[in-house]
Amino acid sequence: MYRLIPLRQLRRTAGVVFDEIVPSDIPVINGIDRVIHKANGISPGPCAGVARPWYMHIGQDDNLLVMRGERFVEIYCPIQKKKESFIITPDKIYKNDKLYCDQAAMIVWPAGIFHRIISGSDGSISVNFSTRTKEFDLSNNFNIFDLNTETGEYKVIRNGALDQPDFSYKYKDLNLLKILQS
């Protein structure tokens, strides 16, 4: 359902903390995602009348490292019908409000695990080292779900593709577009 990857301490000097992620701990990195939340940022936010919806990636494992602030993370396994709660800071991880890992660590959950996050009052910054499987598809990777954690039943309430930016150039002069296309 999840695992922790403690960072290896490489150096501690006055004013400097230097840690590393051992490369063998993440066999494949397909994407490196920088995620910045403002104060009390909620991800995903309220949607379709659901106050606290969920994400679930069909084809992506998440390897989350909090760099600044704190993240309140809930994950849910539909197979085990089990939910876990974490508070993740740059230096510690708490599970169910108890200290669980007293050092910098990355939390990992595989594809198929539901998750949702709230950032603390100072906001937060994280890096996610994503591992993408053959089922990865950006058009559904950020679908938003309504999930019943008692029964495990869920449904898509927002197509994640609707929130993806459109990077295409917008031609102001349609005559120019016609010339370019000829």
Each language-model region and where it sits:
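Histidine-centered metal-chelating micro-motifs
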Residues: A104-I117
